Amino acid sequence: MINYLKSFFLYEIVRGMALTLKYFFKPKVTINYPYEKSPVSPRFKGEHALRRYENGEERCIACKLCEAICPAQAIVIEADEREDGSRRTTRYDIDMTKCIYCGLCQAACPVDAIVEGPNFEFASLTHTALIYDKERLLQNGDRWEQALASKLHKDYEYR
C-alpha cells in the first residue's frame, strides 16, 4: 500500500528533481577540452622522449635495461660498439600501441635517457605513426627538454 501511495504521488520524480536542484546551483566542473586544459601532475606519464646531454650527445648508453624491464615488450633496441669502446644505439623503437605507460623504462634507465614527458596529445589515424623510432624520440626530447628537466627535478626527491 505504501509503495502504491509513493508511486501515486510521484515520489521518485520528486526525489530526482530535488537531486537535480541540489546540483543545479553548484559550480560547473566540466572543462571545454580543446580550449581549456586541466593541470597536469609533475609525475604524469605521457609521450616518450629520448634526452641528450648539453653538448648534443644522446644520453642512451645502450644498456637495454628499459627493453628488459618493459612488461609489454614495447621497446626494441639494437646497438653497436664505437671505437672508444662505448656502446650507442643504432635502433631504438617504441610501439606506443603496446605501451602501458607504467614508467618502468624511465625508472630502470641509469642515465635518465628515456623519459615519459608531459605531452598527452599524440593521437594518430594509423598504427605506423604510433611506432616511434629513435629520431622521433630524440625530436620529442629536444622539443620537451625544458619541461622534462623541470619534471625530473621535481620528481628527484621521490627517487
Curated annotation (Swiss-Prot):
One of its GO terms (cellular component) is plasma membrane. [4Fe-4S] cluster 1 binds at C60, C63, C66, C109. It is found in: Cell inner membrane. InterPro entries: 4Fe4S_Fe-S-bd, 4Fe4S_Fe_S_CS, NADH_quinone_OxRdtase_chainI. It is a peripheral membrane protein. It comes from the Bacteria. It catalyses: a quinone + NADH + 5 H(+)(in) = a quinol + NAD(+) + 4 H(+)(out). Gene3D superfamilies: 3.30.70.3270. Its main location: membrane. [4Fe-4S] cluster 2 binds at C70, C99, C102, C105. Keywords: 4Fe-4S, Cell inner membrane, Cell membrane, Iron, Iron-sulfur, Membrane, Metal-binding, NAD, Quinone, Repeat, Translocase, Ubiquinone. It holds the Pfam family Fer4_7. One of its GO terms (biological process) is aerobic respiration. GO terms for molecular function: 4 iron, 4 sulfur cluster binding; iron ion binding; NADH:ubiquinone reductase (non-electrogenic) activity; quinone binding. Its EC number is 7.1.1.-. The keyword 4Fe-4S applies. Residues 51-80, 90-119 form the 4Fe-4S ferredoxin-type domain. Its cofactor is [4Fe-4S] cluster. The keyword Nucleotide-binding does not apply. Belongs to the complex I 23 kDa subunit family. NDH-1 is composed of 14 different subunits. Subunits NuoA, H, J, K, L, M, N constitute the membrane sector of the complex. NDH-1 shuttles electrons from NADH, via FMN and iron-sulfur (Fe-S) centers, to quinones in the respiratory chain. The immediate electron acceptor for the enzyme in this species is believed to be ubiquinone. Couples the redox reaction to proton translocation (for every two electrons transferred, four hydrogen ions are translocated across the cytoplasmic membrane), and thus conserves the redox energy in a proton gradient. This is NADH-quinone oxidoreductase subunit I. It comes from Rickettsia massiliae (strain Mtu5).
